[in-house]
Amino acid sequence: MNSSSSHRNILVTSALPYANGPIHLGHVLEGIQTDIWVRFQKAIGNECYFFCADDTHGTPVMLAARKEGITPEQLIERVGQEHYRDLTSFGIEYDHYDSTHSKANQEISKDIYLKLKSKGHISRRSIEQSYCETDKMFLPDRFIKGTCPNCKSKDQYGDNCEVCGATYSPKDLIDSHCSLCGTSPVVKNSDHIFFKLGDFHKKDEKSTSLETINPSHLKTDFDLQSWIETSGVVSESEGVKKKLKEWFDAGLQDWDISRDGPYFGFEIPDETNKYFYVWLDAPIGYMASSKNFFEKNFPNEPNKFDSFWKNKNSEIVHFIGKDILYFHTLFWPAMLEGSDYRAPSKVHVHGFIGVNGEKMSKSRGTFIKAETFVKYLDPEHLRFYLASKLGPGMDDIDLSFEDFINKVNSDLVGNLINSVSRVSTTILDALDRTLGVVSKEGLALIEEILYQTVKFGPGEDSIQNIIKYAYDQRNYAKVLREITRLGDRVNRYVNDNAPWKLIKENPEKAREVVTVTLNASRFLAIYLYPVVPKISEQIYKLLNLQDSPSFKDLDKNRILENIKVLPYEMISKRVDEKAIKAMLEENKQSEHSKKVETSENPVPEERLEISIDDLSKVELRVGQIVEAGPVDGADKLVNVKVDLGELGIKNVFAGIKVAYQPENLKGLKVVVVANLKPRKMKFGISEAMLLASGEGESLSLFIPHKDAKPGDRLK
């Protein structure tokens, strides 16, 4: 059971946040889960590196930059800094955080592609592709929405279903439409490049490709299904194995790895206006991030990169959400093995996070951004709470704020921190803040914390080994149950000996109790270090220890005696329910403000049915923006002049600046509510309303057909 019996060399990654939105609690969950595991591996002496990067390519990034009037490079630079700031504010400590838009990533992507091509795993064929006549572009999968052809869930993307996990072609989507303008796309032919995934599954040895770029097809010895079943890469999760079996039984399809320009990404070698699909170079970002780190930090070890990515004696471990299982357990390992790299050792899959028993909701204020959480609450508290919920499977996690308050205040602050604080203030002051020696009785307590035998499954083992094993298996809930139980034992020792009484009657006996308590608490801080590193380091600082907590110090021969202890500083406060309410209220107000500024007449959340007579009262007309400018004192408003043909030019204040820069609006045709009662605002009179859909940076104005004329009425 002892996970530290032999030295391990481990490269760890968490999934890459996409560069067109803020970090929220879903990202934070994965980052914390990964960081705890990495900190544990380092604490027991393993060589372990933690890499991540921003996922920066694709049409969404390109269009988001266009709306802001900046280049994609400028956008991803800013967002990357924001992502890194938000993730590290939760104590997530990367060895290197990179961007997929890097020279190293481009070079490795090219290398992998050309090797796959030379071995016959790449094919070309003409495909029917969705094209938006309004926006004059081929539509990427994520800009097509409709009903899933597999489970019939509505509002799903063009490449995969977030409900059932199925992947498919955009043309298979039912009732598809362009998510930019809402019109139904037309179909055009375009040559695309495919990765023949079926080459890596014996059941699918015959390729379905119509034309092979390299006709000398070479077989591969790597079979995905055998690898999944025998390598243990996902052995701990029956749910994962069941889902993979479904995909194998259905047969593995060739994977389209190209996109037509315009597209923000890497051009495919020897092709014209063809770019790598973002999902090809995104996971390669793991490799590029590690390559950049190794070249900078190990200049005298040129084979450091290969010692992980080409050496199966090392470990490559991915932490991902269950929504990207297909890519990481099928496409990714096949790409690696097919290009002379090695497949991952483990793919650890976690579930989603909800808040108060429901999915995160913007309207209820529970779609919580990382930036907002740290403004009101202690990130260490979230680390502790999520760890108490995390097991080795991929079950979803619920952040119940009532439970959050109780668990943090009771188990962390009221138990594990309390054992330190209750003996470190006035009692230690009266003892010149100096520890004594550990008594025989005290040594028995410390040995209980370090070496006691505990039942585990059908057998038993030492408490240290059980905690280490649970950490290694990502069973953090088990870890915290054991540590909390030990914390109860330490607090019981303090209660039984009452040093606040002894300080008056027998100061040296009080010193002995304090010495035992702080030594016991120090060992608990070591156990806790991967979960709450800041709190553990504060306890170390109190004890005047310069090093970070390390599992090698879990030894009774490392007891601290006759040392001076620093003045006590608050380690952590209890969670205040008022802070949670304030955070949720800010979220709700922020969302409400967006809706108000987007529409002069916000639609209520409850669906309201109207009659045909009501609808006929609304006069929708085509307008053309002839002027657009900012509004002083209103960061989210744009002042536009709209030409409505015979109705003349109307003045409109529109809450669209989050998605559109004024200088990009002139000449744009829009849909206008032309007979809206003029509204007096502090900036002036707003005489109409522009129609738009979506929220935040995804907000899009409704665009009429190019031949429509200003003043035309929509019917």
UniProtKB/Swiss-Prot annotation:
Instruction: Give the record's GO CC terms.
Output: cytosol
**Where's the motif 'KMSKS' region?**
359-363
- Report the InterPro entries cross-referenced here: aa-tRNA-synth_I_CS, Anticodon_Met, Met-tRNA-synth_bsu_C, Met-tRNA_ligase_1, Met-tRNA_synth, Methionyl/Leucyl_tRNA_Synth, MetRS_core, MetRS_Zn
Q: Name one Pfam family in it.
A: tRNA_bind
Q: Which reaction does it catalyse?
A: tRNA(Met) + L-methionine + ATP = L-methionyl-tRNA(Met) + AMP + diphosphate
Biological process, per Gene Ontology: methionyl-tRNA aminoacylation
Q: What class of enzyme is it?
A: ligase
Q: Which domain of life is it from?
A: Bacteria
Q: Where is this motif: 'HIGH' region?
A: 17-27
Q: Where in the cell is it found?
A: Cytoplasm
Q: Where does ATP bind?
A: K362
Q: Which cofactor does it need?
A: Zn(2+)
Q: Which UniProt keywords apply?
A: Aminoacyl-tRNA synthetase, ATP-binding, Cytoplasm, Ligase, Metal-binding, Nucleotide-binding, Protein biosynthesis, RNA-binding, tRNA-binding, Zinc
**Residue ranges occupied by any tRNA-binding domain in the UniProt entry:** 614-715
Q: Which PROSITE patterns match?
A: AA_TRNA_LIGASE_I, TRBD
Recorded E.C. number(s)? 6.1.1.10
Molecular function GO terms recorded: ATP binding; metal ion binding; methionine-tRNA ligase activity; tRNA binding
Q: What does the UniProt cofactor note say? A: Binds 1 zinc ion per subunit.
Q: Which family is it part of?
A: Belongs to the class-I aminoacyl-tRNA synthetase family. MetG type 1 subfamily.
Q: What does this protein do?
A: Is required not only for elongation of protein synthesis but also for the initiation of all mRNA translation through initiator tRNA(fMet) aminoacylation.
Q: How does it assemble?
A: Homodimer.
Q: What is this protein's record name?
A: Methionine--tRNA ligase
**Record organism:** Leptospira interrogans serogroup Icterohaemorrhagiae serovar Lai (strain 56601)
